[in-house]
Amino acid sequence: MKLCVTFLLILVILPSVTGEKSSKRTLSGAALRGDWGMCSGIGQGCGQDSNCCGDMCCYGQICAMTFAACGP
């Protein structure tokens, strides 16, 4: 348990010691903005198949239900 806590502390402190700047696109930032894990429903906008919920596909930038698998 102590080893785990020590490892996590090192991961948190190491970037500040090396002078590495943090990214604005972090997991906590995504959670605060509310866009973490969101998907588009039927008729909603999308950019690719992975933006649509479930087995829906992105056709013409709109999520739609299909009988066949999503295309390439």
UniProtKB/Swiss-Prot annotation:
InterPro entries membership = Conotoxin-I_CS (IPR013141)
SS bonds (residue pairs):
39-53, 46-58, 52-63, 57-70
* Main localization category: secreted
Query: What Gene Ontology molecular-function terms does this entry list?
Result: ion channel regulator activity; toxin activity
User: Domain description from the entry?
Assistant: The cysteine framework is XI (C-C-CC-CC-C-C).
Q: Which residues form the signal peptide?
A: 1-19
Annotated protein name in UniProt:
Conotoxin Ep11.1
Does RNA-binding appear among the keywords? no
Q: Where in the cell is it found?
A: Secreted
What are the annotated GO cellular component locations? extracellular region
The entry's note on the tissues where this protein occurs is: Expressed by the venom duct.
Q: Which residues form the propeptide?
A: 20-32
